């Protein structure tokens, strides 16, 4: 039987996936179908009792969790194709360990305990608002530190890292 041999370590995981399922608190949330997250593993806030992505100009204190990658789920594109215009239920990581994709900084050289920052303004196509970054922008207000989170060690070359959130 053919297989893969991991000579250094196994892959980090999928962005938005919980990495340590024993030590966590996840709450079910209503997602707003008119304000969709671009991907899993992004920081979110509450607006009108719905968990939605951050918007440019939000402050770091608005961050109330991380969107968890659920299974199974029907994608927004599939729901739109079927003509469903209702809010979905999703998962919000309130406390625990999760894999996220950082859009600035070098994930393989990250160290355990390093700070993690969240883009709240100055978003670009490569680093949109709500993503996690390892290094703050030159304009520090764009990427404030999320003091309730820290890195758990080096990540993958494509930017995936494990963070501890509210631990």
What are these regions (language model features)?
Residues 1-167:
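Surface-exposed, low-hydrophobicity beta-strand/loop segments enriched in small/polar/acidic residues
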């Amino acid at each position: 039987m053919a297989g893969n041999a991991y000579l250094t370590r196994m892959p980090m995981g999928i962005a938005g996936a919980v990495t340590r399922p024993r030590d966590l608190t996840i709450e079910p949330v209503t997602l707003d179908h008119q304000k969709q997250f671009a991907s899993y593993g992004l920081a979110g806030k509450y607006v009108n009792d719905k968990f939605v992505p951050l918007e440019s100009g939000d402050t770091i204190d608005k961050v109330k969790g991380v969107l968890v990658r659920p299974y199974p789920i029907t994608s927004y594109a599939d729901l739109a194709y079927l003509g469903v215009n209702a809010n979905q239920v999703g998962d919000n990581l309130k406390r625990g360990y999760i894999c996220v994709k950082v859009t600035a900084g070098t994930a393989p050289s990250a160290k355990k305990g390093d700070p993690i920052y969240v883009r709240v303004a100055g978003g670009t196509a490569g680093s949109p608002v709500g993503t996690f970054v390892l290094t703050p922008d030159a304009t520090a207000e764009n990427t404030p530190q999320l003091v309730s989170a820290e890195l758990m060690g080096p990540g993958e070359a494509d930017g995936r890292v494990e963070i501890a959130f509210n631990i």
